[in-house]
Swiss-Prot record:
Its cofactor is Mg(2+). The heterodimer acts as both an ATP-dependent DNA helicase and an ATP-dependent, dual-direction single-stranded exonuclease. Recognizes the chi site generating a DNA molecule suitable for the initiation of homologous recombination. The AddA nuclease domain is required for chi fragment generation; this subunit has the helicase and 3' -> 5' nuclease activities. Belongs to the helicase family. AddA subfamily. Residues 9-474 form the UvrD-like helicase ATP-binding domain. The gene is addA. Keywords: ATP-binding, DNA damage, DNA repair, DNA-binding, Exonuclease, Helicase, Hydrolase, Isomerase, Nuclease, Nucleotide-binding. This is ATP-dependent helicase/nuclease subunit A. The keyword Nuclease applies. Residues 491-785 form the UvrD-like helicase C-terminal domain. The keyword Membrane does not apply. Its EC number is 3.1.-.-, 5.6.2.4. InterPro entries: AddA (IPR014152), DNA_helicase_UvrD-like_C (IPR014017), DNA_helicase_UvrD/REP (IPR000212), P-loop_NTPase (IPR027417), PDDEXK-like_dom_sf (IPR011604), PDDEXK_AddAB-type (IPR038726), Restrct_endonuc-II-like (IPR011335), UvrD-like_ATP-bd (IPR014016).
């Protein structure tokens, strides 16, 4: 029983009902800004306070973890407040304890807890972990590799047909992409295999094909009838004209055709497919114009109606009936086995992927849902015993953002709720008009089905409550939004009727100052009048709107009833995507306005990130021209376009630019300076390649950053803080990647490529807080749930993305899979019945979701809403005004063929302000007759860019004469003096800039060796090219023998951890020790065969091992960084102030004396007659400089004499001479 609402409460009647109604399933349709979160919290509190329900017996499901934390905090706060008011209430005391066990979480979190408690039902290891994003992406890719490999081995005829249709000559990327899409679609269903198995049914069953034909017929009929009306208008106008017999003859022919085509309830598809238009409509010549003087506009209008008719019929012919019905149905039969085989491949992927995850003991988010469902259901799909216990435990289940659930989540909820809809305990809150996550497999039809089934009385099934009062926005925003959607959204296009229950009602305590919505149409300047593109012009125009807000607008404080000046943080720019972000950033920078792109996209497009990725791709495989040349052209290596052209010209027919570099370097006519530059570049590449063989990706990135001062350089540019954060972000992602079960540069690059392909960005690293005074740009998706005083909704002229509609395979969650028919023999593809039908359905659903995105964008605004669209000329605006009207809405065909949001928005809002529009193209004759809730309050402004632009066109490439330059500088002696001082300045520490600030001991060794030979070391370094040919890429190499330097690193790793004890290690114990290194992942398992066991045993059996084992203290792999001045005994006035860094293999202390040991895996040639002493002297001489630095460094640090040994595994111990 709902309690009587007191007069002094803040809740509306609908909110009050939402808080207290119970006894059946309840769906609360909460419009934007209607206070649904407050209602949800209050309902939880009242269930605790009024009904004595324990908080841990409520299951509250939110959409995000952040929402869950905020919800839990609010509930906890309210419980504490109630407890303070009634300190003796034991029930409230218990709630303060139980709140910590309360199930207020995302559904994924609930599923995870369920699995942790009932893992025994699933027969899985309880110590499972959640896979990282990188791990999951790469493992799925690997699984698809394996499954396709199996099918390539079988070469089933249907598989061959699929590969012929879905793969290109170069790769099978499209085929793989379709498999992945099908995988994600299928697992969004409670029974993925069942969903996949039914995909082929429409291709086999005639009754299903008839249903598809009827669906196509119904859609095509809409366009044909609209075409008939356009043709009739054309006929009526031409009938009033003189000398238009030819035009009327054509129109009469078309009238006969379309009358025959649309007679009856079913279209005559044969007539449509066979119909051919005249190649050209008879021209409106000067004779006709003279005969109809003063009626030129009517002539043009008549022709426009005919053109519109033709375009509508052509759409039907091309999109729906390009082939006759018999051909469409015959192709379905031939496609059936092909579709069934594709479904089988996806089933194989699901099974194999599951096995791969189990072998690694990992779960992903889809596993959470499906494993939870296995726990909660029996084999027949009925609720399990465990589900019954949860039903008994939870008094109520509350679901937030219900419009964003999918079929799997719906099934989980149905298992743990009690009763049927008329007596259940499920409370759902959401707004289907804000369902904008179809790309995540959210299914708004679940909400719509319940919305239509439930009633406001709740007598027949569940109870439906509409929360429509908006407490966020001014009246002008709400009424204009209502007017727009009442004429744009219905069940046909939009999937829900925007009726009185769905519309927004004003509820915020604003003053009565008018703030009309601004609908701004920017007419582009031509290329003759502006150097800027249309997008750049729009960005500048938006800046002007921001300036106007800051200079002239105020923000109303509803609590105090006072105004304050608008600030930058009050303003948000909303767009469909981040495509315009770069232009906006530049425009705001040019005007010194603080601006931040709140981006979850665009990370990989950042200059600094692209540089690092080009570097990584080049290191992995320099035979990729785009990345190799990109790296060469970058700020790091600074090759000019002229130099690159010079390299290419020498051997223009090389397959790869890397080959051109090699050929250029040996060309007799090559520029020696360019060859030197190339040598340094190649040396760098090979150095990093060698490093990447033994080090993880994040260390390779870190080395690149340090070697080339990448962080420092980008930090000094505009936006340096964000750039630095982006670089560190990539490094951190590489660290995360290494923590997965995948390793190596190739796999990391593959992970990045997958993220890019999926348009799943890391997001630019956010360096701006919520209170920073900046103008923000964000996508509509990321703005959901937020509000701003001023919203500039721009980019309205950007076309809807209908690219997926052109794919050879169309997927729909409800209907299944539509595949084009591909004739293998003719190598030609044709639309099939299924692909035509599902393409039309998806187009309709796409427009519906775009409408919902418009709704979300408009309802973010509190004070004022500014809509910005862009057109080439004003003729487009007239065309939008004239969109056909059907009853109270824009005609269905106009909505389905709309190319962008601006067509719809301007087409609705401009009609009532157009003085010349005929009544049949209006919604009403007088908007003043409308009630306040739907009366549009909109100011339409048409601006030509030339009229509003402050752009100053400056050509920096202008060639000026000496005389002009002299004239500019005449009489400006002070400037001349300052310029001379700047240009002639001599840096006092120039020598130091020629030397690195930090050098390794190995680098110093090479430098001193060359300088002692009277050779410049920098010159020598240019020619350290290494191997002449490039190895095969890693992914093409089956087995690979380790190089000498890799074996050296491996031996050092073994020695680093080698235990020293007086009872020497046996050979078996050494093998056990190496196995432990493998278990700890310190070395790879396949490395075991490359470890020189006998050489290590020789060391263990030798005297040096025993001396170390008996030492007082032993330190291994000791790093050091020391000032070279101190090591070399220089004075502080000496020019070279470099820092030396290095790593000493082992140091031990015996009786107060320190010794260091450096292991060497060098091979050497014993010439005939050479004694051991001669070989020893040769080896000591080779490492004399390095050992001297080691000893001097240790003596500098320890302040005492130090002795040292070189240990050669192939020779033995050598003591370092004093």
């Amino acid at each position: 029983m709902i309690p009587t609402k007191p007069h002094d409460v803040i809740w509306t009647d609908a909110q009050w009902q939402s808080i207290y109604a119970k006894g059946q399933d309840i769906l609360v349709a909460a419009a934007a800004g209607s206070g649904k979160t407050a209602v949800l919290v209050e309902r939880i509190i009242q269930r605790i306070l009024r009904d004595d329900v324990d908080v841990d017996r409520l299951l509250v499901v939110t959409f995000t973890n952040l929402s869950a934390r905020e919800m839990k905090h609010r509930v906890d706060k309210r419980i504490q407040e109630a407890s303070f008011k009634d300190p003796n209430n034991e029930h409230l005391k218990n709630q303060r304890i139980k709140i910590h066990q309360a199930q207020i979480s995302t559904l994924h979190s609930f599923c995870l807890k369920l699995i942790q408690q009932h893992y025994d039902v699933l027969d899985i290891d309880p110590h499972f972990r959640t896979s990282s994003e990188a791990e999951n992406i790469l493992l799925l890719e690997q699984t698809i590799d394996d499954v396709l490999e199996q099918h390539y081995d079988k070469l089933d005829p249907h598989f061959i047909e699929l590969t012929e249709q879905l793969s290109s000559d170069r790769n099978d990327d499209q085929f793989r992409s379709i498999i992945k899409q099908l995988y994600f679609f299928s697992i969004a269903n409670p029974q993925p295999f069942e969903w996949l198995n039914q995909l082929a049914q429409p291709y086999k069953e005639e009754n299903k094909q008839q249903q598809l034909m009827q669906l196509i017929n119904d859609l095509a009929m809409i366009f044909m009838k609209a075409g008939y009306e356009e043709l009739q208008k054309s006929y009526d106008l031409f009938s009033m004209m003189e000398s238009v017999d030819k035009q009327l003859e054509v129109i009469e022919t078309e009238r006969m055709f379309i009358t025959k085509a649309i007679e009856g309830k079913v279209l005559n598809t044969d007539v449509i497919t066979q119909h051919e238009f005249m190649s050209r409509f008879p021209a409106i010549n000067s004779k006709i114009k003279e005969a109809n003087e003063g009626m030129e506009d009517a002539l043009n209008e008549a022709k426009q109606h005919y053109d519109k008719y033709k375009s509508l019929v052509m759409k039907v012919k091309n999109d729906y009936f390009s082939r006759n019905a018999e051909d469409l149905q015959r192709d379905m039969q031939q496609l059936a086995p092909r579709v069934a085989y594709l479904a089988q491949i996806v089933q194989d992927v699901i099974q194999s992927f599951g096995v791969q995850k189990r072998s690694r003991n990992i779960l992903d988010f889809s596993d959470y849902e499906h494993f939870a469902l296995r726990i909660l259901t029996n084999e027949d799909g009925s609720p399990s015993r465990i589900a019954e216990t949860y039903r008994e435990h939870f008094k109520e289940i509350l679901v937030d953002e219900y419009q964003d659930t999918n079929r799997v989540q719906e099934k989980i909820l149905s298992c743990i709720k009690t009763g049927e809809e008329h007596d259940g305990n499920l409370f759902m809150v959401g707004d289907v008009k804000q369902s904008i996550y179809k790309f995540r497999q959210a299914d708004p039809s679940l909400f719509i089905e319940k919305y239509n089934r439930f009633s406001s009385s709740g007598n027949e099934s569940g109870l439906r409550i509409d929360l429509s009062q908006n407490f966020r926005s001014r009246q002008e925003v709400l009424s204009t939004t209502n007017y727009l959607f009442k004429h744009m959204m219905d069940e046909q296009v939009g999937e829900i009727s925007y009726d009185d229950a769905a519309q927004l009602y004003f509820g915020a305590p604003y003053d009565e100052v008018s703030h009309p919505v601004q609908l701004r149409a920017l007419v582009e300047a031509s290329s003759e009048n502006s150097d800027l593109t249309g997008s750049e012009q729009e960005a500048n125009y938006i800046v002007e709107q921001v300036k106007d807000i800051i200079n002239h607008q105020n923000v109303y404080d509803m609590k105090t009833g006072q105004y304050r000046k608008a600030t930058y943080k009050d303003i948000v720019i909303l767009e469909r995507s981040f495509g315009q972000a770069r232009n906006l950033q530049q425009a705001f920078k040019n005007n010194d306005i603080p601006f931040h792109v709140n981006s979850k996209e665009g990370y990989f497009e950042q200059t600094e990130v692209r540089l690092v990725l080009s570097f990584l791709r080049t290191i992995d495989n320099p035979l990729q021209d785009i990345y190799l040349v990109g790296l060469m052209r970058s700020v790091i290596y600074q090759f000019t376009e002229e130099e690159l052209a010079e390299i290419r010209v020498v051997s223009p027919h090389d397959d790869y630019f890397y080959q051109s570099i090699k050929n250029y370097m040996i060309d007799e006519k090559a520029d020696s300076r360019l060859v030197d530059k190339l040598n340094r570049f190649i040396q760098d590449i090979q150095k990093y390649q060698n490093y990447s063989q033994s080090q993880p990706v994040y260390q390779l990135i870190d080395k690149f950053y340090n070697d080339h001062f990448v962080i420092q350089y980008f930090s000094g540019l505009i936006g340096g803080k964000g750039r630095r954060a982006n670089l560190y972000g990539l490094f951190n992602k590489a660290v995360e990647f290494e923590n997965s079960s995948f390793r190596g540069l190739f796999q990391f690059i593959r992970f990045i490529d997958e993220l890019i392909d999926r348009k799943k960005d890391f997001g630019e690293e956010n360096v701006v807080g919520p209170n920073d005074n900046v103008v923000r740009m964000m996508t509509i998706h990321s703005s959901k749930g937020l509000e701003f005083p001023f919203v500039i909704y721009s980019g309205l002229s950007k076309k809807f993305n209908k690219g997926d509609l052109n794919a050879p395979v169309i997927l729909n969650q409800q209907y299944g899979l539509g595949m084009d028919y591909f004739d293998v023999n003719k190598d030609m593809a044709f639309p099939s019945l299924a692909s035509v039908a599902y393409r039309a359905i998806n187009e309709k659903e796409l427009i519906s979701e775009e409408m919902r995105l418009i709704y979300v964008a408009l309802t973010r605004a509190k004070e004022q809403l500014i809509l910005v669209g862009r057109v080439k000329d004003e003729k487009s605006l007239i065309k939008y005004e004239q969109l056909a009207v059907s009853d109270t809405h824009i005609a269905v065909n106009e909505r389905l063929t709309a190319t962008n949001p601006f067509v719809l928005i301007y087409g609705v809002l401009a009609k009532h302000q157009s003085p010349s529009l005929p009544n049949d193209q209006r919604f009403e004759r007088d908007i003043d007759q409308l009630n306040s809730e739907v009366k549009p309050r909109v100011s339409i402004v048409i601006d030509h860019y030339e009229d509003v632009s402050t752009e100053e066109v400056v050509n920096d490439n202008e060639i000026r004469t000496i005389e002009e330059l002299k004239a500019i500088n005449t009489g400006n002696e002070d400037v001349k003096i300052k310029i001379h001082q700047q240009l002639s300045y001599d840096y006092p520490f120039k020598v130091n800039t020629m030397k690195p600030s930090k050098q390794s001991v190995s680098e110093l060794k090479r430098q001193l060796e060359t300088e002692e030979s009277n050779t410049n070391y920098d010159r020598v370094r240019q020619y350290r090219i290494g191997v002449a040919s490039y190895e095969r890429p890693k992914f093409l190499t089956q087995t690979k023998k380790r190089k000498a330097n890799e074996i050296g690193t491996l031996m050092h790793t073994v020695m680093q951890h080698l235990p020293f004890r007086e009872q020497r290690l046996t050979k078996d114990e050494l093998f056990q020790y190496i196995d432990r290194l493998i278990d700890k992942q310190l070395i790879d398992e396949d490395a075991k065969e490359d470890i020189r066991i006998d050489e290590i045993m020789h060391f263990i059996d030798g005297p040096l091992y025993m001396e170390i084992a008996q030492a007082d203290n032993v330190y291994t792999e000791l790093p050091f960084v020391v000032n070279q001045i101190k090591v070399d005994g220089l004075t502080s006035e000496d020019e070279d102030v470099s820092i030396i860094q290095g790593m000493i293999d082992l140091i031990y202390e015996s009786d107060g004396q320190f010794y260091f040991v450096d292991y060497k895996t060098d091979a050497f040639n014993r010439r005939k007659g050479m004694s051991d002493e001669e070989i020893g002297n040769q080896l000591k001489e080779k490492y004399q400089i390095q050992m001297t630095y080691y000893r001097n460094t240790l003596e500098t640090i320890l302040k005492r004499p130090v002795k040292g040994y070189l240990y050669f595994f192939k020779f033995g111990t050598l003591e370092i001479d004093d």
